[in-house]
């Protein structure tokens, strides 16, 4: 076969194999991807670095994959040159939506399992997703070079899970490269070729997009039918816009322009559009010369699990925050946001996230990539509140909570799957009960590991549940959760009052049993953070009109007796009474300004906050105030 036949746009569909690598966090997906890039020779030895496909600084620092990356890899088998389309996916539960989009662009999935850890919660979750997409599963044990690896034991676990023989489970080492060649051969043999029609009208599915400040929107596509040529006009079927493409190409592993993309291939299109609303993940691209009549089925829009407010420390940065969120939305289809105003914090956005890690990554990317200093409010989940007059309110922010009598509050629930060694069953049960969880079933997946299924309110999981689960099980337990309907609960809104005024940024919706502890925690924290004034300041926590906790910030006092050396007690008493009357009048007229740094510190180290940059933010707040 001539060299021409393996060029992008001319590759015979029967020689294409599209696959993704799925696994639990830290099971070695990115390392195996590195070895595949090295073996295929598309990355020269001197340019190779660890976690080659993790392009973001945050990914490199944290050692986690956040964005899926699609790469075209050549591979020879039995004297025939094949083209492999490889997608490296994230492993964390917050980025499941990234994984589901990657699965829709493939025909096969490499299920990677750490030979020292075995099957974990995300392994199962990703496996079930791959089965839902009808993908061919290739089971692989990674890290077999480690002394603590137990490949035989875990090969049997995997075999019983997916219904194959233990001998069918491949054994590789991402570190040494052992077994990777056999894995690539197995992909060529087992993964089916794409089934699109190369002669039909062109249809390509957008599965991701990024913003390039020089060239505009870069759209990642999977060709399903027909072909797209670089000189033809393109039509976005969902948005209804038409473009002359600046460039069409493949990623191998850097962008490589080509003349065309054919059926079954994965590549990119640069349209030159700068308007971020013009590229929607899940849309279908077709050619205006031979337009398709039916668009491809897109993706189900992800539902945010957690809401939080993002406010610029300097209010003048509000337009920049809007622009930054628009650009980030291109690259992160799961992020949703709308403008909001807070009495205390000014203008900002109410953002919806898939989880706490997702929230932390978004705030960090906004501050790094766009140079913004932000305050994020405590995370909330969406509630449905029915007032006594029958009106229903959807509440994503405590300030939207209706006043007056409440008939019913419904909160979102999740089905949590926890896998843990059997010696920690008691500790996990205690933790779930403390967080209002109810157990549904429990089964042993091997002689020493248990899978427990719980139904838990989402509000209990989004704060510190995962950290506590890890600490109580010495890091061995793993957690996966998904939406499981709603349930009525006894919830209340706790307001924080300073000098009798409600401060909306500190309000929270909590379970009645935890209302007192939240009130005590916030009042104590604010007492330390708010500077003393010339008069006494009461800090109160209230449910409706009932005060449940109180702290006082004592008044600063000038020593009015300093000039009295001895003398009559009535003279001293007169001066003290005069001071007292002045303080009383000041207390009635005085207004307490809560400094910006107090907001930053109280919200960053609140229950949900795990913000490591609190001190930097406080400094930035002080600068912007000064």
UniProtKB/Swiss-Prot annotation:
Stretches for region Disordered: 603-626
SUPFAM superfamilies (UniProt xref): EF-G C-terminal domain-like, P-loop containing nucleoside triphosphate hydrolases, Translation proteins
Superkingdom assignment: Bacteria
Binding site for GTP: 26-31, 142-145
Enzyme class, broadest EC rank: hydrolase
A Pfam cross-reference name: EFG_C
Basic and acidic residues bias spans: 609-626
Catalytic activity: GTP + H2O = GDP + phosphate + H(+)
Cellular localisation: Cell membrane
Keywords for this protein: Cell membrane, GTP-binding, Hydrolase, Membrane, Nucleotide-binding, Protein biosynthesis
Gene Ontology BP term (one): positive regulation of translation
InterPro entries: EF-4 (IPR006297), EFG_III/V (IPR035647), EFG_V-like (IPR000640), EFTu-like_2 (IPR004161), G_TR_CS (IPR031157), LepA_C_sf (IPR038363), LepA_CTD (IPR013842), LepA_IV (IPR035654)
Entry's Gene Ontology cellular component terms: plasma membrane
Record PROSITE patterns: G_TR_1, G_TR_2
E.C. designation(s): 3.6.5.n1
NCBIfam families for the chain: lepA, small_GTP
Protein function: Required for accurate and efficient protein synthesis under certain stress conditions. May act as a fidelity factor of the translation reaction, by catalyzing a one-codon backward translocation of tRNAs on improperly translocated ribosomes. Back-translocation proceeds from a post-translocation (POST) complex to a pre-translocation (PRE) complex, thus giving elongation factor G a second chance to translocate the tRNAs correctly. Binds to ribosomes in a GTP-dependent manner.
Family statement drawn from the similarity comment of this UniProt entry: Belongs to the TRAFAC class translation factor GTPase superfamily. Classic translation factor GTPase family. LepA subfamily.
Stated name of the protein: Elongation factor 4
The organism's taxonomic lineage, starting at the top: Bacteria, Bacillati, Actinomycetota, Actinomycetes, Bifidobacteriales
Gene name as annotated: lepA
């Amino acid at each position: 076969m001539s060299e021409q036949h393996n060029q992008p746009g001319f590759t015979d569909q029967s020689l294409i194999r599209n696959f993704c690598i799925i696994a639990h966090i830290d099971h070695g997906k990115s390392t195996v991807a590195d070895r595949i890039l090295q073996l295929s020779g598309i990355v020269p030895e001197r340019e190779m670095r660890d976690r080659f496909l993790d392009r973001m600084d945050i990914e490199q620092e944290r050692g986690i994959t956040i964005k899926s990356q699609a790469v075209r890899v050549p591979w020879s088998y039995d004297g025939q040159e094949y083209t492999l389309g490889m997608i490296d996916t994230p492993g964390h539960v917050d980025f499941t939506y990234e994984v589901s989009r990657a699965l829709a662009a493939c025909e096969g999935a490499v299920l990677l399992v750490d030979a020292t850890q075995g099957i974990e919660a995300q392994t199962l979750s990703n496996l079930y997703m791959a089965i839902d997409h009808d993908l061919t599963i290739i089971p692989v044990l990674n890290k077999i070079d480690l002394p603590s690896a137990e490949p035989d034991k875990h090969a049997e676990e995997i075999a019983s899970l997916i219904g194959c023989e233990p001998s069918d489970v491949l054994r590789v080492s991402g570190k040494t490269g052992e077994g990777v060649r056999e894995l690539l051969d197995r992909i060529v043999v087992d993964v089916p070729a794409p089934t699109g029609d190369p002669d039909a009208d062109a249809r390509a599915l957008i599965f991701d997009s990024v913003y390039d400040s020089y060239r505009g929107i870069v759209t990642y596509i999977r060709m399903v039918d027909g072909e797209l040529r670089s000189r033809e006009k393109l039509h976005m079927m969902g948005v209804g816009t038409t473009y002359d493409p600046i460039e069409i190409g493949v990623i191998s592993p850097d962008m490589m322009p080509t003349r065309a993309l054919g059926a079954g291939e994965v590549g990119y299109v640069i349209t030159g559009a700068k308007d971020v609303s013009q590229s929607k993940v899940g849309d279908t691209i077709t050619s205006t010369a031979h337009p398709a009549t039916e668009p491809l089925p897109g993706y189900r829009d992800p539902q945010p699990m957690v809401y939080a407010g993002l406010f610029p420390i300097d209010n003048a940065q509000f337009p920049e925050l809007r622009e930054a969120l628009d650009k980030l939305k291109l690259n992160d289809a799961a992020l949703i946001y709308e403008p909001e105003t807070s009495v205390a914090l000014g203008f900002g956005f109410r953002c919806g996230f898939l989880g706490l890690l997702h929230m932390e990554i978004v705030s960090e990317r906004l501050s790094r990539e766009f140079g913004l200093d932000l305050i994020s409010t405590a995370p909330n989940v969406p509630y449905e509140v029915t007032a006594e007059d029958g009106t229903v309110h959807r509440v994503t922010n405590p300030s939207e909570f209706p006043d007056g009598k409440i008939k019913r509050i419904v909160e979102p629930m999740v089905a949590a799957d926890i896998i843990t060694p059997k010696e920690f069953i008691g500790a996990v049960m205690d933790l779930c009960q403390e967080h209002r969880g109810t157990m549904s079933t429990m089964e042993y997946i091997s002689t020493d590991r248990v899978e427990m299924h719980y139904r838990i309110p989402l509000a209990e999981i989004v704060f510190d549940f995962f950290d506590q689960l890890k600490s109580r099980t010495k890091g061995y337990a793993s957690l996966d959760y998904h939406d499981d309907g709603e349930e009525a609960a006894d919830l209340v809104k706790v307001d924080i009052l300073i000098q009798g005024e409600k401060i909306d940024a500190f309000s929270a919706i909590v379970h009645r049993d935890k209302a007192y502890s939240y009130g005590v925690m916030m009042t104590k924290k604010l007492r330390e953070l708010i500077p003393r004034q010339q008069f006494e300041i009461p800090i109160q926590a209230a449910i409706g009109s009932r005060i449940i906790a109180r702290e006082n910030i004592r008044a600063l006092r000038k020593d009015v007796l300093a000039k009295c050396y001895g003398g009559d007690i009535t003279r001293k008493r007169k001066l003290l009474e005069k001071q007292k009357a002045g303080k009383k009048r000041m207390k009635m007229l005085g207004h307490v300004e809560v400094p910006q740094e107090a907001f930053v510190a109280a919200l960053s180290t609140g229950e949900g906050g795990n913000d490591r940059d609190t001190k930097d933010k406080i400094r930035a707040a002080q600068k912007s105030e000064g």
